[in-house]
A protein has these predicted regions:
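Domain-scale recognition of functional cores that engage charged ligands
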Residues: 1-170
Length: 170
């Protein structure tokens, strides 16, 4: 029997509190991480910090630019966009602990034709890996606050890869 993700690896790597370290250039430099690596991490990981009672007032004031996610959760379960956050839910987040605040990274969008109508769908790209190797790359198309598989015309879409040397920036 193979469990994926491996429970031990999941416990080590899936906790979103790791993103607080990986998105903090000063802490990475103290740990001896090379500047080119820090630059790559900064480009790919939105600024993330743990939600603590000590930071509650500052995070509440900055909430419109943040997304709040359970540190140990996955998907969009119990995740809240800050500009839609109610004070009651905010109190639950602070009282319950175990959340991170992440700078909002707006998704890209693609125009698609559904039943002869043009529609703009948000998208994200996912790389599914096993044993350190990418097995599948897919796009998820959706409308709304978080990804879902209920959007008309949405769901999974293929991603066509090209060689990096063929890429010419616009």
């Amino acid at each position: 029997v193979v469990l994926t993700p491996n429970p031990h690896a999941h416990a080590l790597y899936a906790d979103k509190r790791n993103l607080a370290l990986l998105s903090d250039p000063a802490r990475l430099a103290i740990l001896g991480v090379a500047q080119p690596t820090i630059d790559v991490l900064r480009a790919g990981i939105p600024r993330t910090e743990e939600v603590t009672p000590e930071r509650a007032d500052a995070l509440w004031a900055a909430r419109r630019g943040l997304f709040f996610k359970p540190a140990a959760g996955f998907g969009s379960r119990a995740a809240y966009r800050g500009d839609k956050l109610t004070l009651r839910v905010w109190r639950d987040i602070i009282d319950g602990g175990g959340y991170v605040a992440q700078s909002i990274a707006l998704p890209s969008a693609r125009r698609v034709r559904i039943d002869d109508e043009d529609s703009d769908l948000k998208l994200d790209i996912r790389a599914y890996a096993y044993m350190g190797r990418i097995q599948l790359v897919a796009a998820r198309l959706y409308m709304g606050q978080t990804t879902n598989l209920r959007t008309s015309g949405g769901g999974f879409a293929p991603v066509f890869l090209t060689r990096s040397e063929d890429f010419v920036p616009a």
